[in-house]
Each structure stands twice: as C-alpha cells, then as structure tokens.
Amino acid sequence: GVQMRDSVMEMSLSSAMERMTDAERGILVRQIRLSLGDSSAETEIKVMSGNHDYSHADDSSSLDAQTPLNPMYTLSVGNIISLKSYSAIRVAQTDLSDVRSFVFSEQGGAVLGRDGYVKRLAEDGSTHALMFSGRMMKTICKGNDSEIWGIDTSGKHIMVDDAGTVLTLDVPGLVSAQTLHSMSLSPEGDRIAFSIESDGGAQSGVAIIGICRDHDGSVAGLSQAFALVSTQSNVSMMTFYNDVTFLYATQYERGRAQIGRRQMVPGPETSQALPDNGAVDMATGEVGTYRRLVVLDHLGVVRTVDGSLDGAWTIADSQVTSLSVQ
C-alpha cells in the first residue's frame, strides 16, 4: 500500500524489484511516480524494496506523461466552445445539427453526422468536403496533425484521412465474429485503442495496437497483432489521459449500472468513478489550464474531475451536444 509521510508518498515493493535490471526498475519507478503524481514527473516519492531505496531509479528515464495540451472543445447550441480558460469561450459559430461526434482544434477538424458521413470542419466552424472518400463511419477521433481516424460502419476496418489522403487498414487478428466500435489514439499518435464486440463466437473487450509510420511520419499500416488489455464488453467510450493512463466506460443505459475503468497500459484494471448522471462520452483535454478528464452526461452537462482521477466532479459547461474527440 501507499502511505503518506511528511508530504511524501511511500511504498514498499517485493524482492522482485531487486532482480530487475536498472532499466526495468527505472521504468517501474517512473510509472509509479506518474500514476501517484497525477502525471507529474516531479512528484516526490519513496520506493523501498527490503533495505534498498529505489526512489531515484528513474532519474535517467525519459518517460513523461506531460504531453502537449489540446484545448477541450464542446458543441453547444450551434456554437463551438473552448474550455481552455476557466470560463467557456465561443470560438466559432456553426450550423451543425444531428451530430454524432466531432473533432476540433485551432486548425479545424471534422464532424460525423448521424447519417454516417464525415465532413471537414474549418476553423471558423463551416463544413466542407466529405472525408474518407465518402465512406460512412461509425466513429471518429483525432490523430497527429491533420489526421482524422475512424471506424467504418462495417466495424471491420480502421481508416485514416490525412488532408484528403485516405488509407483503409485491416486489423490483424480480428475474426469474422468480431466488430470494432469506439476508438482513441494515444497522445504520441503511435497506438490505437479500440473496443471489440463479438456475437458470442469470439472474445469481446478492449485492445491496443501499434501504428507503423514512414520516416516522414505518415501512416504506413498497423503492427502485426493487437494486445487485449481488458475483457470488458459493451465499451462505448475511451480516452488516453496521458501516455500511460487509459480510461474507458461501458455504454450508458438508463436504470443500469455503468462501469468505468482505468489502467496503466498494459496493467490491471481499477475502477474509475463517473458522475452520478453517468457518461455518454469522455475525452481528455485542457480545461482551466490543466489537462483533465472530461465527461458528457445524457442531460448535456459537461463535468471535469479536479486534481487526481479520484477527485470531485465540477460542472464546466451545459446544453452540450458533443465533446471534441481527442
């Protein structure tokens, strides 16, 4: 367990720590530091194993969860709202309606309509040409730079549209009984997480697969196999809180318990508390100058969790149709 002593979090690990290499100990201690410090690599901790103090085993580690902050945007009553500052600010006006999900940044983004078609979204909120070569999609999310990723309506293919260059990717190891549903890209853009549903003849759950990129950073394909990180079924939303912490939740259904989970991937799952009204979408972005978990409920209220992921929920916006999917 973790104990607090003189404002320093202390823990004692098993003798297995002593059998690790210096590099392995460094990664483990850095992951512990990032996890306990809510992504801060400067958090002071004390890590002991027997009589050995490994508190500084990660001094040479470059692993860092301080990823660039992407401002969180919402779609609210025809307006695109930035939550970057402590007060919601309108940054664009739009005629978007019947929106399933959208992606937005200072350079624009994309919008997925309930009809399944994706249109490019300019920075002023106006919509333009169809994306993904006119293919219908079930979900979209943001990638590196101008990349927009998505899952087609068949649930069998992952697609990426990078400024009009479209690539369709098969997922190695996906069998006929399995389909893809929600998805999210890691902050560095080299991993995709996605939920898998099965008709009963195969495994459901949450998986992560690597993205292969060319020397110029463009997408070349997917790695040879995906790693199943959870066997939780019915997962409809997910987000990378940082490089190492991943969150997901099951589909919201009125009157039924909703399950939220988080884990340091790959690693064991722990429960993630959700607001009392549940969640219909989640994302991670800059709110009030800090990187925060953001959740939208079925009443259109956006809440963020303060401090650690176990902190209290605070209302950030209301009358919201959709969160910008980071």
Identify the meaning behind each predicted range.
Residues 1-326:
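Bimodal "functional hotspot" detector
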